[in-house]
Amino acid sequence: MPLEQRSQHCKPEEGLEARGEALGLVGAQAPATEEQEAASSSSTLVEVTLGEVPAAESPDPPQSPQGASSLPTTMNYPLWSQSYEDSSNQEEEGPSTFPDLESEFQAALSRKVAKLVHFLLLKYRAREPVTKAEMLGSVVGNWQYFFPVIFSKASDSLQLVFGIELMEVDPIGHVYIFATCLGLSYDGLLGDNQIMPKTGFLIIILAIIAKEGDCAPEEKIWEELSVLEVFEGREDSIFGDPKKLLTQYFVQENYLEYRQVPGSDPACYEFLWGPRALIETSYVKVLHHMVKISGGPRISYPLLHEWALREGEE
């Protein structure tokens, strides 16, 4: 059976938005007004939902403004900005349709990002490299002008949620291979029919423990995960059974240790880094990684400097 057919039921339905916001991916921006938030909400990476891959091809994207020499670096494209200016001068004539046009455009763009993420996850599961030509032909299609934005957001999604990085190994042929973040040897796949790597979830847990010190109480882990809308006893659309991941899979892979707090009555439990995590990465690398993907110092790690000094002495 083709890989794409085997993996159809593995697509998550929702959850990326909350995870991206909680990790600070869009938190580095200045506060926006309600109108600005409404206009730009669908442009953020974390609104991409893999379960919303369209069955039919998205409509053609708008053509670039005449004379434009480079792709805009934000989602507030000059084409739409000019449309807003024009519409603001016509308020007395009736409501403008340009905001609706932008909303539709941003939604279509987000679907393209979601479709590319799903395509890349299939490639990762098959352990195959991917080329720019494949991405353009299989996913992007006539949205080639916006490929840099689509590719950037899809790459950020892979790194933030799934713990996967894309590395260009052939700049001429634009060939990319997949690598797990922080050089971890764990691919995050739990079975033959899984395309949703759990490496990103593991990195989040390692970061929570590092933030706490040498160990983290189990209740603290769940408190932090609740911000990502991941809860004990509730199946997650991306990560599956989080309790089983934490106390069984990651422990069996030697990335975590799960033990009873000595002398606790009633019994309390805590998590520590396992021997495999200690060999493959370090506290400071994990914390630096989380700060990087958060887009800035929104997540506070007071022990970051302490651990950096400690590792420098070793």
UniProtKB/Swiss-Prot annotation:
Q: Does the keyword Ubl conjugation apply?
A: yes
What is one term from the GO cellular component aspect held by the record?
nucleus
Q: Where is this region: Disordered?
A: 1-99
Q: Where is the composition biased (Polar residues)?
A: 65-87
Gene Ontology molecular function terms on file: histone deacetylase binding
Segments of skewed composition (Low complexity): 21-44
**One GO BP annotation here?**
negative regulation of autophagy
Identify the InterPro entries for this entry: MAGE, MAGE_N, MAGE_WH1, MAGE_WH2, MHD_dom
- Any single Pfam family the record assigns to this protein: MAGE
Q: What's the domain of life for this entry?
A: Eukaryota
Q: Which cysteines are joined by disulfide bonds?
A: none
Q: How is it modified after translation?
A: Ubiquitinated by the DCX(DCAF12) complex specifically recognizes the diglutamate (Glu-Glu) at the C-terminus, leading to its degradation.
UniProt KW keywords: Tumor antigen, Ubl conjugation, Ubl conjugation pathway
Signal peptide span: none
Q: Return the Basic and acidic residues bias intervals.
A: 1-20
Q: How does it assemble?
A: Interacts with TRIM28.
General function of this protein: Activator of ubiquitin ligase activity of RING-type zinc finger-containing E3 ubiquitin-protein ligases that acts as a repressor of autophagy. May enhance ubiquitin ligase activity of TRIM28 and stimulate p53/TP53 ubiquitination by TRIM28. Proposed to act through recruitment and/or stabilization of the Ubl-conjugating enzyme (E2) at the E3:substrate complex. May play a role in tumor transformation or aspects of tumor progression. In vitro promotes cell viability in melanoma cell lines.
Entry protein name = Melanoma-associated antigen 6
